[in-house]
Amino acid sequence: MIKSKDDLEYYLKCDKVALKIPSNRFFPRPFFDLIWKYEIILRNTEYHKNNSGLFHKLLYYYNRIRLERMSAKLSISIKPNVFGPGLSIAHYGGIVVNPNAHIGSNCRIHEGVTIGATNGSNRAALIGDNCFISFG
């Protein structure tokens, strides 16, 4: 859970390493680093959701709109506070994760994956650290 600026920087750094982004690149390249951009927006949304105050609330709604637009563009549905640090999305397209799921750090997820609950229950998957999730 991202509660402070230090936590946000740590999560973003771990995600950047997991995506194998070169350390000398500080910003996502337009049209190329769409997954990295998605993860930055996701982490910023998590940060502002977990903090209180008018400033954080306004930025949460702004980032949530950006996240929903990017989710529709990439066909990825991941809600805030589901993944730990070190998230690596291999390819965009067809990724759906239940908002009640909790997945640990250093997770790599491929396209065509659905992590959900059964029979309409609120209980969802609890997946540990250092996992590789793929279709099949």
Where is each model-derived feature located?
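Short amphipathic alpha-helical segments, especially helix-boundary/capping motifs
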Residues: 17-22, 60-62, 81, 109, ...
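Residues at structural and domain junctions
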Residues: 27-30, 53, 83, 93, ...
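Short linear elements at protein peripheries
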Residues: 56-100, 106
